[in-house]
A protein has these predicted regions:
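Conserved acidic/glycine
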Residues: 1-39, 158-159, 163-167, 185, ...
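Short, surface-exposed connector motifs at secondary-structure boundaries
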Residues: 26, 58, 154-155, 215-218, ...
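A short, small-residue-rich loop immediately preceding and capping a beta-strand
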Residues: 27, 63-64, 115-118, 148-166, ...
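Cofactor-binding active-site loop characterized by glycine-rich and histidine/acidic residues
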Residues: 37-178, 393-394, 426
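General beta-strand structural signal in soluble alpha/beta enzymes
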Residues: 67, 157, 166, 186-188, ...
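Anionic-ligand anchoring segments at beta-strand to alpha-helix junctions in alpha/beta enzyme folds, i.e.
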Residues: 86-114, 196, 214, 379-407, ...
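Thiamine diphosphate
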Residues: 98-110, 134, 138-142, 147-152, ...
Length: 665
């Protein structure tokens, strides 16, 4: 056994295995298989190839590393501890998966220093890695000058069979290959084991051939514990400047633990005390003491970290010279990284200007996008092959492509799930604001990655058009019903449904000024009138558009989007019958709920119990505002194929029906 300890690299690799196994055992839950199987890959990359600096985790030109298989989080935490990121102590590893610890079950962005993205849903990290690689190429094309490669780094992702089974990886890698993202290097932990058993039961395709078809260079490491072979693979990946690279590393899940390695049982449960003891004996580890790491191993990692500093020092020197030689680029750089940029440039009269003609809110949003792109040069975005319909094309900004990384219009293709992960990755990279777009009914395809946006606090903007039965002729498959309620239910998410130009401008202003909350806009296909009384108060989520002349209104009509005009017209008709109502616009329930109780009570006073909510989607969620005595005019079934002018009356979205329902209270 002693011969296994004569190599400091081997000891350093095994330190990752031991810390991972002990932390998972102490927590009584976790996934030891990946950390044990991929320890050699991670060590070789982090110690000898990754451009990073634990002393400055936010260095802008660092390489990015994404653990797409987030269940293997102890691999990442062990690395962060051994490399000294954020002073992550051994005691933090001992608190793995515990309340309030720095080591949650899956890596969480902004929670643990050195974690580049929240991962856990398999394949998500692959999509975000593609987004980061896109951001790197775009920023490089904007800022680099001859002799000054101020943006020049790689994005690495590590995932396993599960990541490769998930459809999002195919979506993302298909686009990455098309875009020739040569700064993207993906490690495939090919251990041929899934939770239910061998991958032979459900996953027998030739993954390498698939990746070749996507346009990747493919490299195979036959021995996942051979550091030299792994290192050569990384260098070969870097040498290809025309294609992204996919490195298949043949590993053994749970490597080092005799009773578990190569078995499905190594994946998602603690190894057990006896098996950990046997593992340490097998690895020649000098102590059975939990979490023990020899001082010589810590010293070795410290030496590695000291060796990482010169790369950043050289970059800092180059960047200082660059800023002196190109002061206009330094100013632009600061603009890209200014988190308060939108507040400074998107609050002028022209930004909020509108004309009185009726228009679809998707068209009004398109105008806002083009106003924003002129004010914010760091905005990049696009649609899932729908920009002509969602009105998301930025004029005169070019298309992002393998031939033009400076383009600001992204063509994501029909890949909504990957599009959203890529949008997250673009923003996680830093320096850019991103938006993504599709039809509202297909927002379902974006949901898992949008959920990560909310969890991470990444203020990605979603442009969802064709927002109700107003879609009309395309029928129920294309008419959203339950989607609005779903998005409103998401924590840390602002779901806007604006009614006219003023509210659309407010929704966009809220989106681009948001620091930690993603925002979505649900926009109409059909034209809507400009409404008297809408204002910037829409930024509060809900507000009084037209009030009653009485101190206490006879009733309150609440509406959003295309139905606000119905509410306003109903108010006029009711007034003729001596019923004086208040009209409240509710473009964003989420923001309204963030207001003070005093403000909410002012808009919706508790002593006015006669309330009607009007919205051409599911009525789910409106109960909190109309109460037991109120009424909801909404959709309780799927739509139909017909002109919207036929559908709205059929389903009760008319002035006459709103008036009748108010009178019936």
């Amino acid at each position: 056994m002693e011969t296994k300890m004569n190599n400091i690299d081997t000891m350093s690799v095994n330190a990752i295995r031991v810390l991972s196994a002990d932390a998972i055992q102490k927590a009584k839950s976790g996934h030891p298989g990946l950390p044990l199987g991929c320890a050699s890959v991670a060590y070789e990359l982090w110690a000898k190839h990754l451009k990073h600096n634990p002393k400055d985790p936010d260095w802008k030109d660092r390489d990015r590393f994404i653990l797409s298989g987030g269940h293997g989080s102890m691999l990442l935490y062990s690395l962060l501890h051994l490399f000294g990121y954020g002073d992550l102590k051994k005691e933090d590893l001992m608190q793995f998966r515990q309340w309030g610890s720095l080591t949650p079950g899956h890596p969480e962005y902004r929670h643990t220093v050195g974690v580049e993205a929240t991962t856990g849903p398999l394949g998500a990290g692959m999509g975000m890695a593609v987004g980061m690689a896109i951001a790197e190429r775009h920023m490089a094309s904007v800022f680099n000058k001859e002799g000054y490669q101020v943006v020049d780094h790689y994005t690495y992702a590590l995932g396993g069979d599960g990541c490769m089974m998930e459809g999002i990886s195919s979506e993302a890698f298909s686009l990455a290959g098309t875009l020739k993202l040569s700064k993207l290097i993906v490690f495939y932990d090919s251990n041929r084991i899934s939770i239910e058993g061998s991958t032979d039961i459900a996953f027998t395709e030739n993954v390498q051939k698939r990746m070749e078809a996507f346009g990747f260079q493919t490299i195979t490491v036959e021995d996942g514990n051979n550091l030299e072979e792994i290192g050569k693979a990384i260098e070969a990946a870097k040498a290809d400047t025309k294609r992204p690279s996919f490195i298949t590393v043949k590993t053994q899940i749970g490597f080092g633990c005799p009773a578990k390695q190569g078995k499905a049982s190594a994946h998602g449960e603690p190894l057990g005390d006896d098996n950990i003891k046997a593992m340490k004996e097998n690895l020649g580890w000098p102590s059975e003491e939990p979490f023990f790491v020899p001082e010589e191993v810590y010293d070795h990692y410290k030496e590695i970290v000291e060796g990482l500093q010169p790369a950043e020092d050289a970059w800092n020197k180059m960047f200082a010279e660059y800023c002196e030689k190109y002061p206009e680029m330094k100013e632009l750089w600061d603009t890209y990284y200014d988190e308060d940029l939108a507040e400074k440039v998107c609050d002028d009269s022209e930004f909020w200007a509108y004309d009185d003609k009726a228009d679809a809110t998707r068209n009004l949003s398109g105008k806002m996008i083009n106003r924003i792109k002129d004010r914010m040069p760091n905005v990049i975005g696009g649609a899932a092959d729908l920009s002509p319909s969602t009105k998301t094309y930025m004029k005169d900004e070019g298309d992002f492509s393998a031939e033009n990384y400076a383009g600001r219009n992204m063509h994501f293709g029909v890949r909504e799930l990957a599009m959203t992960a890529i949008g997250n990755g673009i923003m996680l990279h830093g320096g850019l604001r991103a938006f993504v777009s599709t039809f509202f009914v297909f927002s379902d395809y974006t949901k898992p990655m949008a959920r990560l946006s909310s969890i991470m606090g990444v203020p990605l903007t979603f442009v969802f058009t064709h927002d109700s039965i107003g879609v009309g002729e395309d029928g129920p498959t294309h008419e959203p019903i339950e989607q609005l309620a779903m998005w409103r239910a998401m924590p840390n998410f602002h779901m806007f449904r604006p009614a006219d130009a003023t509210e659309t401008a407010a929704a966009w202003y809220s989106a681009v000024t948001s620091k930690r909350t993603p925002t979505a806009l649900a926009l109409t296909r059909q034209n809507l009138p400009q409404i008297d009384g809408t204002s910037r108060e829409a930024l509060k989520g809900g507000y009084i558009v037209q009030d009653s002349k009485k101190a206490v209104p006879d009733a309150i009509i609440i509406a959003s989007g295309s139905e606000l005009s119905l509410a306003v017209e109903a108010k006029k008709v009711l007034a003729e019958d001596g019923i004086d109502v208040r009209v409240v616009s509710m473009p964003c329930m989420n923001l309204f709920e963030e207001q003070s109780e005093e403000y909410k009570a002012k808009v919706l006073p508790k002593n006015v119990r006669k309330r009607v909510a009007v919205e051409a989607l599911s009525g789910f969620g409106w109960d909190r505002y109309v109460g037991l005595d109120g009424d909801i005019i909404g959709m309780n079934r799927f739509g139909a194929s017909a002109p919207y002018s036929k559908l709205f009356p059929y389903f009760g979205f008319t002035v006459e029906n709103v008036v009748a329902r108010v009178k019936a209270l």
